Amino acid sequence: MKKLFLICAALMLSCAMGTAQNTKFGKPSQLDWSMVGWSEAPDAEAIVLCKTLNVEYELQSDFKSYDNSTSELSAESVAYGGAGINKFISEDKITMTYSVKMRTKILKDSGAKYANLDIVYYWEEKDRTHSDDISSLSIVVFDNSTGKVKKRKLNSSCWTEERLDANYMVRHIRVADVKAGDIIEYQYDLTSRRATFLYDWQVQEDIPVLYTKCEMNIPAFLTFNMSVPVHPFVKSKVEEASVTLPQEISDLQAPKKVKSNYYTIESRDMLPKALDLQRRQSETPAATVGGEGDFEALK
């Protein structure tokens, strides 16, 4: 009976981790520290405690969009342009920022490799007009082995750059001296000038993911072929919203807004890809959210 109680308690803990996950970064919670394994994936070497993505578009005040008849649309009426019109927009007046956050815990010493991170980004060899920018990159290792939490902030010495082809590069982040029990937090922004290209977002990983949330506020004149996974643990919705254009401080008029679609994709307690595929007997492919592209923001 005692053994049965312990098993039930472990299952209850796993459920609690999924429903009360700490989404604030900078200070792991007591629940994060108490996580020493997950009954649903007992062989897991590491676990993603929390992973979030927020995509926001920024339009300059003189941004212009055109419908397929090339007639100019004002900031007020652009929302009513034909759906999917993305060819006739002034791309130099629009940018988008991917704000990525992830917290991973190493469960076994053999899982230290999951502290590493690869960021693929667009960076042309010749014309860098539309190249991506990576900013606000922060990597912090939290160690609680002595009962007192110690923070270790990493700098640029822990990463290298590699060119993949004429258009893309990858930033390899390698975190050394990581052991079982350590928690690693990553945060960065990726600014893209390619408004009609949407990078993919991985809901599922090679290790368990307790909580992930993807939010995208996309102007309505841009329409992507969203591939939201059909999975019992994934919930998605889209709501009407808006993108506010910047204005001068002296401008007393109401700020101009462009109609947008606000997408939210959220999942809890996702099994590793291989284990999930095995249990579900190949009913559904590994979960991915994305548009036109093959980018894996986090690996």
Predicted regions and their residues:
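Bacterial Sec-dependent N-terminal signal peptides
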Residues: 1-24
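Beta-strand-rich, non-transmembrane domain signature
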Residues: 21-299
